[in-house]
């Protein structure tokens, strides 16, 4: 009898004996968990690459290199992971284009540069925040989806008591156990997603803040450059 009890209460047995609704809930949560883990690894690698590229480009930028030379280097060998490089290229390209126009007002040049860099920052912000809405959704909804599966399973367990002459704990325990697995899977999917979302949100805000700081400093350099040459 003991092997039968062990088999009846094993994890796989509980899942396979669950109702179709509970199994669908479990399958949905497992799929959400697997997808969120894939996105967690992808976002983690992307964030590390973006920070590494930012540090490397700022080191080159503040090394005293000529801005035109740096622009040519960035254009000939662009780094797709370097958001700050894209911001620099957008700003300097607009600066060079407007400066070539005869009689253009210096303030109009700087307004164009600021506008171009704001657009570039917005694009980089979208890249950094990719997948974060999905992680937030998984983290906030998975426990409730799991709870729905649990409630449904417990309801089925108690409905099954109507066909039993004598209700005992052994009668309802397997049904309740299989229902609680849905809640466990929901928490397993939600907890990593919430942690990853908070961590990546903080990293994204830090990188975006540094992008804005770089843009302000770069604008200050171009402002001096355009007004000095104008004088």
From Swiss-Prot:
The chain crosses the membrane at residues 20-40, 134-154, 176-196. It is a multi-pass membrane protein. It is found in: Cell inner membrane. Keywords: Cell cycle, Cell division, Cell inner membrane, Cell membrane, Membrane, Transmembrane, Transmembrane helix. One of its GO terms (biological process) is protein import. The keyword Cell membrane applies. GO terms for cellular component: plasma membrane. The Tol-Pal system is composed of five core proteins: the inner membrane proteins TolA, TolQ and TolR, the periplasmic protein TolB and the outer membrane protein Pal. They form a network linking the inner and outer membranes and the peptidoglycan layer. Part of the Tol-Pal system, which plays a role in outer membrane invagination during cell division and is important for maintaining outer membrane integrity. Belongs to the ExbB/TolQ family. This is Tol-Pal system protein TolQ. It comes from Pseudomonas aeruginosa (strain ATCC 15692 / DSM 22644 / CIP 104116 / JCM 14847 / LMG 12228 / 1C / PRS 101 / PAO1).
